[in-house]
Amino acid sequence: MLCHELDLSDSPRRAHFEHFRHMPDPHVGLTVDVDVTALVQRCKQEGWPFYPAMIRVAVMAANAVPELRRRIRGETVVEYDACDSSHIELLDDGSYCYCTLRHDPAQSWPDYMAYAEAQRAKARAGASIEEEDDVEGLYFITSVPWLHYREFIHPNPGPEASNPSIAWGKYQADWRGRLMMPVTLSAHHSLVDGLHIASFYQNLNQLLQGKNEKGRSKN
């Protein structure tokens, strides 16, 4: 994953960066219900598991927002060209392990799903919560498929932790028959504001409806 250092000297958010950076808990997050009807239907038609499909869509939505690709590195900020993901895999004994997925937007859906399933199986066999590589360029992803929740609080190792975290819960039908699912995004407020969080959800909704970030239907 390639990245470059940002020059914050003349950034309009320089003051905001310094202000939130020194707070004991500088993280901000929102939970929003999103319509996953189309993705659930496609997964059923293709015989795909929903979890890795949703991971891909969430990563695509996040990568379309530059602020979510930024990380605090010491006294500097770096921006990745694109970020990959580390997600939780549930194990048979009720514990969990971590699984890293690489995300290539040019990869076809069938190829991605085959790759993701192979990586998930490998991770479960290893059953480790030790990350394979440097985690700086990753999104941290988890799922709580047993609950349709209203709020989710991500654990953070400290105020310098700047990897965005994404979670979702159980999808269920609303009064219109749409399958709605809570999705939570948490990020470092020194790097990300409400506008950027809103952009993530706009991208996510468009992708879930089969559109790209510009709103045009995908082939």
Tell me what each language-model feature is:
Residues E160-K211:
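Active-site-proximal acidic secondary-structure segment that organizes catalysis
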